[in-house]
């Protein structure tokens, strides 16, 4: 058997792509047309985004083409070849009816897959030496073009001034070992049970097909689709092209009991699996009984209601749904008795808020100073507050850290946030005449360090935000200068404040109907707002300390009855799926929770 496998590898050099130079494609469309379209994109690309029709992401199907021999109408790849003469020959065969056509010169990059290497002996046309571009080729990847007039190739290149050498220099096509999972063979194809593809087969592909054929076929198709679309997302992020939003699903969950807006309510990872549920309180119509209610996320943005009764829900200031013991499950914590005990109802797998734990006596501090902050080096949250002895943070195991400061800052400016990126929440607020930002930084040694900015604009009241503008640090941001500019500050690695400004994509006057959230999976918060007139969500992506001017629009399937970010209307992410999707979930009335799921490509 080892001998046979060795022979296969000799006959098919499956782990090495032979070409690392530039690539070529013959096309009838002019450079201006290609530029206006944003690049060389496949036929299925436009219908995928504009009409919602499926795009074929099977490299095997792309290489085979349609039964007529033409390109598939739903094709998700763009063909290229490795030398200009081959491109000229292809052009003469398929574009002979055009007096003039073009051969585009394309820079190597990981969106290009070596068809022969990936498909091996199953490559239908190995003589073509084709490299296929997954999802197409952005205009910024095109180095230039040659003109073919009446069949004669002019070898003088016309340079593309929009070519991004800073992005595409020194890149290479995707390695076969990175691409076998994208081969796109049918679920029952023998390749999935052979070397090398068996080692890269997505779940359900080629394994025990005869035993559970239908399930495996569906699993194989779904897993291949998720892998390819995640790859497409990553490529578009790497190439810094304008991204697109695609609606992928609409769900409607009925008989949902929504939390009462008079109490705390939060979207939380109730099960520790990345799917957010909506939890809060409700009170019987006669006011006789209070309960915790959660719209529990069952997966795929479908929900059902759960109810939990407790003997004591504690005082309003200090109530939170957080992970108190670091086990990944959400607990319910509060201050009980005469503001003297920290109490948490801990969750067990499938048993929410079922195990009560008392941290013992403590000074609960001043009402408006109470907050929960993430403890550095753990997944726990601690209860933090200002007391007569200074600031104290205490966890459910009664471990405390403390610091003193002579200025607790303005009430409408206080945030607990990881402004220095070390994994623990710091206490930040505006001091003096809203002119300086002061933070007490949580250190890994349990000690606290105070830092203060130089003069800055504290911004408009109620328009101050905690935003992850960069991938590893929370930024303290304020709306300033006629509501069109945002200034943000963070603590740099040398321990000093860095303040910068950026233009907003729209004027921002209040917090209603906006939300900062990462919708494209790059660990940076984007900005979204609800527009009531056309009933749409509009988002602008974070481009690292700036927001794109390219507006992404989602048309909602129903009308939300509350404003975005107010509680029952929220954009949420799912983190347990390769497709990296988000959804705008909202109370549509009559006990219905609607979720319009979308993906950013």
Swiss-Prot record:
- What residues make up the catalytic site? 130
One Gene Ontology cellular component annotation held by this UniProt entry: extracellular space
Q: Which residues of this UniProt protein bind NAD(+)?
A: 26-43, 130
Which keywords label this protein? Disulfide bond, Enterotoxin, Glycosyltransferase, NAD, NADP, Nucleotide-binding, Nucleotidyltransferase, Secreted, Signal, Toxin, Transferase, Virulence
Task: Quote the EC number.
Answer: 2.4.2.31
| Secretion signal, residue range per the UniProt entry | 1-18
Give the intrachain disulfide bonds.
Answer: 205-220
Main localization category: secreted
Q: Which family does it belong to?
A: Belongs to the enterotoxin A family.
- What is the protein name given in its UniProt record? NAD(+)--arginine ADP-ribosyltransferase Chelt
| Species, as recorded | Vibrio cholerae
């Amino acid at each position: 058997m080892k001998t046979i496998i060795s022979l296969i590898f000799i006959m098919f050099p499956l782990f090495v792509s032979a070409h690392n130079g530039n690539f070529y494609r013959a096309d009838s469309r002019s450079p201006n047309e290609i530029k206006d379209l944003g690049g060389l994109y496949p036929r299925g690309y436009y219908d995928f985004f504009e009409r919602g029709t499926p795009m074929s992401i099977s490299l095997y199907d792309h290489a085979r083409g349609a039964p007529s021999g033409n390109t598939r109408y739903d094709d998700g790849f763009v063909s290229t070849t490795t030398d200009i003469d081959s491109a000229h020959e292809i052009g003469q065969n398929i574009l002979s009816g055009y007096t003039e056509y073009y051969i585009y010169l394309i820079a190597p990059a990981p969106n290009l897959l070596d068809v022969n290497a990936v498909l091996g002996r199953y490559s239908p046309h190995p003589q073509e030496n084709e490299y296929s571009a997954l999802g197409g080729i952005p205009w910024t990847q095109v180095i230039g073009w040659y003109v073919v007039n009446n069949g004669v190739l002019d070898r003088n290149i016309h340079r593309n001034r929009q070519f991004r050498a800073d992005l595409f220099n020194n890149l290479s096509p995707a390695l076969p070992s990175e691409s076998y999972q994208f081969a796109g063979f049918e679920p029952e194809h023998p390749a999935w049970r052979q070397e090398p593809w068996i080692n890269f087969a997505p779940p359900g592909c080629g394994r025990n097909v005869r035993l559970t054929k239908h399930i495996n076929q569906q699993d194989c198709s779904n897993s291949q689709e998720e892998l390819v679309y995640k790859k497409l997302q990553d490529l578009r992020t790497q190439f810094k092209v304008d991204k697109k939003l695609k609606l992928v699903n609409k769900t409607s969950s009925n008989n949902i009991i929504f939390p009462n807006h008079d109490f705390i309510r939060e979207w939380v990872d109730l099960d520790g699996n990345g799917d957010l549920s909506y939890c809060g309180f409700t009170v019987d119509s006669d006011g006789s009984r209070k309960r915790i209610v959660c719209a529990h996320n069952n997966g795929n943005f479908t929900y059902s209601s759960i109810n939990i009764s407790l003997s004591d829900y504690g005082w309003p200031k200090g109530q939170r749904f957080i992970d108190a013991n670091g086990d990944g499950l959400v607990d319910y914590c509060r201050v009980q008795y005469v503001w003297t005990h920290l109490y948490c109802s801990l969750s067990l797998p499938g048993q929410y808020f079922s195990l009560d734990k008392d941290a013992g006596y403590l000074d609960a501090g001043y009402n408006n100073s109470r907050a929960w902050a993430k403890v550095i080096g753990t997944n726990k949250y601690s209860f933090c507050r200002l007391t007569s002895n200074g600031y104290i943070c205490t966890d459910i195991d009664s471990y405390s850290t403390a610091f003193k400061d002579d200025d607790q800052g303005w009430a409408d400016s206080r945030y607990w946030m990881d402004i220095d990126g070390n994994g623990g929440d710091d206490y930040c607020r505006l001091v003096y005449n809203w002119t300086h930002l002061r933070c007490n930084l949580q250190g890994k040694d349990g000690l606290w360090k105070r830092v203060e900015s130089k003069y800055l604009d504290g911004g408009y009241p109620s328009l101050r935000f905690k935003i992850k503008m960069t991938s590893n640090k929370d930024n303290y941001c304020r709306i300033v200068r006629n509501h069109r500019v945002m200034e943000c500050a963070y603590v740099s690695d040398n321990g000093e404040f860095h303040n910068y400004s950026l233009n907003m994509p729209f004027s921002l006057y209040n917090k209603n109907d906006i939300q900062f959230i990462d919708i494209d999976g790059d660990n940076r918060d984007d900005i979204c707002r609800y527009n009531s007139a056309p009933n749409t969500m509009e988002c602008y992506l974070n481009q690292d300390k700036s927001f794109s001017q390219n507006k992404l629009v989602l048309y909602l399937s129903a009308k939300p009855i509350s404003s975005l970010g107010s509680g029952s209307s929220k954009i949420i992410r799912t983190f347990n799926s390769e497709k990296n999707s988000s959804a705008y979930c909202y109370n549509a009335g009559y006990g219905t929770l609607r979720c319009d799921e979308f993906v950013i490509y």
